[in-house]
Amino acid sequence: MAFAGLKKQINKANQYMTEKMGGAEGTKLDMDFMDMERKTDVTVELVEELQLKTKEFLQPNPTARAKMAAVKGISKLSGQAKSNTYPQPEGLLAECMLTYGKKLGEDNSVFAQALVEFGESLKQMADVKYSLDDNIKQNFLEPLHHMQMKDLKEVMHHRKKLQGRRLDFDCKRRRQAKDDEIRGAEDKFAESLQLAQVGMFNLLENDTEHVSQLVTFAEALYDFHSQCADVLRGLQETLQEKRSEAESRPRNEFVPKTLLDLNLDGGGGGLIDDGTPSHISSSASPLPSPMRSPAKSMAVTPSRQQQPCCQALYDFDPENPGELGFKENDIITLLNRVDDNWYEGAVNGRTGYFPQSYVQVQVPLPNGN
C-alpha cells in the first residue's frame, strides 16, 4: 500500500514536470473556476493582512507589542500566567498629568487642579480605548481568525487535492493506463472539482456575514469616538471654568527676601550688621583663586556604578523579539525584573529582556532584586 502511494506521488511529480518543462497539455478548467480561484487567493491575502493591520491600528506602538510578546513567551516558558496589557498613550499621559498635578498641590494652584482634571479625562478615554480593543477583538478579529483557520483552510485543502487528482488523471491518460484506472482517476478528479467549486462559491458568496463584521467594526469606532467626544466636551467646559477662576484671582505681590531676612550673620560672608562689606587689611596676602572641590565635582556627576547594573558573563544572542543581545563583559543597566529568571535592561542605547544566568549583578535594583 505504501509502495502504491509512493508510485502515485512519483507519477504526479512526473506529470507536473512534463507540463512545465516538456510542454505537455494538462486538463484545462473553465474561466469561471479560474476566476473563483483568483478571488479566493485574494481573500486569503486579505484576511491575513486585515488581521495584522487591525492589530497595528489598535496597538500602534511596535516596541510595546514586542515587549508584550516577549513577556508572554517568557511567561509560557516559566509556566507563570502573567497579565500584560497594552499601555494606551492616553493612559500614559493621564498618569503624567495626575502625578505632577498632585505634586504641585491642588489646594493653592489652579494649574494643578486643571492638570488633575485633564488627567482624569484622559484616564476615562484610555478605559474607553480598552473597551474598543475588546469589542474589535471579539466581534471582528475572532471571526476573521475562525474564517482563516476553518473555511479558508478547508477550501485550500480541496484545491490542493484537486490539483493532485488532476495530475494523476492526466498522467494515466498520457501513459494510456487501463480503462478502469483512468475511469477511477477521473471519478476522483470530478469529486474534488465539485468540492473545490462549492467551497469557493460558498466562501465568495457570503457577503452578508462579511459586511456585517465591517458594520460592527464601524459601530465600535463610532461609539469610541462619541464617548471620547463627550469626555472632551466636559473637560473643555471644566478647563474654561478653571481659566476664568485663574483670571479672577487677585495677583499676589511678591517681595524677594534678603540675607538679613533669613537671619544670616555676616561672619562668613563678609557682611556686617548694616549690610556693608567688612574691611580687608592691605597687608594681607591675596587670596588664592577659587577652585572647585573634588567632592563637589563628584556630586554633580554621579558614578555609573550607583545605577542598578550588571556585568555580562557570556555572550547572549537574542532569539525572540524584545530580547537584548550583548557581549561578554558588557556593563548592562538594570531597568526591571520580569521574574525569577529574566531581567529587563539597557546597553548601547538598546533595551530588552535577558536571562539572569548570563550576568553577574554589581549594583542591585532598589527593591533588592
UniProtKB/Swiss-Prot annotation:
Residues 275-294 have a biased composition (Low complexity). SUPFAM superfamilies: BAR/IMD domain-like, SH3-domain. It is found in: Cytoplasm; Membrane. Its main location: cytoplasm. Residues 305-364 form the SH3 domain. It holds the Pfam family SH3_1. It comes from the Eukaryota. It is a peripheral membrane protein. Required presynaptically at the neuromuscular junction. Implicated in synaptic vesicle endocytosis. Belongs to the endophilin family. This is Endophilin-A. It comes from Drosophila pseudoobscura pseudoobscura (Fruit fly).
